[in-house]
Design a protein with these regions (language model features):
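N-terminal, Lys/Arg-enriched amphipathic/low-complexity engagement segments
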Residues: 1-46, 96
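Short histidine-centered loop motifs in beta-beta connectors
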Residues: 43-52, 56
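Short hydrophobic beta/alpha edge segments that flank linear recognition/processing sites
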Residues: 53-67, 82, 93-99
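Conserved hydrophobic positions within beta-strands
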Residues: 76-78
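Acidic low-complexity segments
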Residues: 80, 85-137, 148, 204, ...
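Gly-rich Lys/Arg/Thr-decorated short loops/hinges at beta-loop-alpha junctions or inter-strand turns
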Residues: 131, 154-168, 291
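Histidine-anchored nucleotide/phosphate-binding helix
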Residues: 173-189
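Hydrophobic alpha-helical positions that pack around
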Residues: 193-305
Length: 306
């Protein structure tokens, strides 16, 4: 794009784990799964003490517009429903599960079959997907804006401008097929013309890899977009401007500018859900910092405790 760049700053990068393949975290003895993992109304537990649950089984839901269902990340026995103080000062309801380490898959897990936009939106809600870049806004709502007929562009936020984190970087190298599939599904059912993956220039291997996969598949309506490695290129307003040249003033949403935008992990999870039927039960994350002897990226079950 020919427009000027918005003001940003250079921060030192400590991407120690960029070259490390993702590891799968061992299943812990106990998980505590919050019923408030999203913006909006918290879920109500649908299980009780003594119930045996399996991976992917529905644990909580609520009949509210802004919410998302929550599923079990492990197989094991529910040992209690607890309440604890949340990070923002409220009260969280937790489903506590003693794991059996078997990771038995819930029998009803199967890839969804959809034929139209309402079916797609329902499937995305059933998956429990929320924005996985930090905001945790329910994805099925973001994919169905009021002015959906005016939306034409998909933007994937893969900037990952934080100094230490490399989990999105590893996802782009390791889960490329799910990422592209998730984008194609969203574009097909929402009716979007073009898609962009915004990636900072300090990830040349991810850019080259995705470009090759797109070329090999003959996909021409999805492109990578190289961003400066400056902070905060991953901020919503900055990313929309960098890719489209359109300014998001106060009170303006991406959809108001014809854009649907979400994190790269979210789209990869869309692809994974439609491929396997497994809802959101795990998250890839970077473990790094001065107190960490062996920095790495791990896939951890939701509810695992530090």
């Amino acid at each position: 794009m020919s427009h000027k760049h918005l003001h940003s700053i250079h921060v030192n990068h400590y991407k120690h784990t960029a070259g490390c393949a993702t590891e799968v975290m061992p299943i812990p003895d106990v998980v505590k799964i919050s019923m408030s993992q999203h913006i909006g109304a918290p879920c109500k537990p649908l299980v009780q003490k003594g119930d045996y649950v399996k991976v992917g089984q529905l644990l909580g839901d609520v009949d509210a517009f802004v919410s998302a269902p929550i599923h079990s990340s492990v197989s094991g026995t529910v040992t209690g429903i607890e309440e604890q103080r949340s990070a923002v000062g409220g009260v969280d309801t937790l489903v506590v599960i003693e794991t059996d380490k078997k990771q038995e898959i819930y029998e009803e897990i199967k890839p969804p079959v959809v034929e139209d936009l309402p079916g797609f939106i329902k499937a995305v809600r059933d998956s429990g997907l929320v924005g996985l870049g930090g905001a945790s806004f329910p994805t099925h709502i973001k994919f169905n804006p009021k002015n959906i007929d005016d939306v034409h562009t998909l933007i994937v936020n893969a900037a990952e401008c934080e100094p230490f984190i490399t989990s999105d970087h590893r996802l782009m190298l390791e889960d490329t097929e799910d990422l592209i599939s998730g984008m194609q599904l969203a574009m097909k059912y929402i009716g979007l013309d073009e898609g962009f993956i915004g990636i900072e220039e300090n990830k040349p291997d991810a850019i080259a890899h995705i470009d090759k996969v797109l070329a090999d598949k003959g996909i021409t309506n999805i492109k990578t977009f190289k961003l400066q490695a400056r902070y905060p290129k991953g901020a919503e307003r900055v990313l929309v401007y960098e890719i489209t040249g359109k300014t998001m003033n106060a009170g303006v949403l991406p959809a108001d500018l014809g854009v649907i935008l979400s994190n790269v992990t979210t789209f990869a999870k869309v692809g994974e859900y439609f491929r396997t039927g497994m809802p959101l039960v795990s998250k890839r994350m970077t473990v790094d910092g001065d107190a960490v002897a062996q920095p790495k990226n791990v896939i951890a079950p939701i509810g695992a405790m530090i």
